[in-house]
UniProtKB/Swiss-Prot annotation:
Entry protein name: Mediator of RNA polymerase II transcription subunit 22
Family: Belongs to the Mediator complex subunit 22 family.
Localisation: Nucleus
Subunit structure as annotated in this protein's UniProt entry: Component of the Mediator complex.
GO function term, MF aspect, one: transcription coregulator activity
GO biological process, one term: regulation of transcription by RNA polymerase II
Pfam families (alphabetical): Med22
Gene source species: Caenorhabditis elegans
Translocase among keywords: no
GO cellular component, one term: mediator complex
Disulphide bonds in the chain: none
Alphabetic keyword roster: Activator, Nucleus, Transcription, Transcription regulation
């Protein structure tokens, strides 16, 4: 019985690992596609913003206006595609956080313990620095009080 349960456990574990790998591959694909969309659309917006210095290309005013509205609409569509890709990246970030929270407790526990240790170390260093400054200020204050007392005493006697 225990051999069967162990086999089922290994099978479940490998299935979980395969599922995690598929999810991670999907995250990578989404990231790659959205970044590519942002880059391509930004490149095409910059390319469309270039002004054609050749006025001879337009025989009449209608040609200029047609190109202007075409370029304007193309830039608006590309800007909207960039917004959509950015929104998808935000969703991807939320999905990654959810995935990490649900599937990687060991990683989170390790990071929390590491952050706590770092915080305690920083607190200890700051406390030591505070104590050093406190003793230094106390010594300076004592020297000043002694100097004032000696000078004040010498003047009024």
């Amino acid at each position: 019985m225990s051999g069967v349960a162990g086999g089922a456990s290994k099978k479940s574990s490998s299935r979980t690992m395969a599922t995690k790998k598929l999810i991670i591959d999907e995250f990578k694909r989404r990231l790659r596609d959205n970044i590519k969309s942002l880059n391509d659309n930004f490149f095409h917006i910059i390319q469309a913003a270039k002004v054609n210095p050749d006025d001879n290309a337009y025989k009449n005013q209608t040609g200029k206006m047609t190109e202007f509205y075409t370029t304007k609409n193309e830039m608006a569509v590309r800007a909207q595609l960039m917004v959509r890709a950015s929104d998808e990246l935000l969703k991807l970030t939320a999905d990654l956080k959810e995935f990490l929270i649900l599937h990687d407790f060991h990683f989170l526990t390790h990071n929390i313990k590491q952050a706590e240790a770092q915080c305690e170390e920083t607190l200890r260093q700051q406390s030591h620095q505070h104590n050093c400054l406190d003793s230094e200020v106390s010594n300076i204050l004592f020297d000043l009080e002694r100097e004032i007392a000696e000078n004040f005493y010498l003047r009024h006697t």
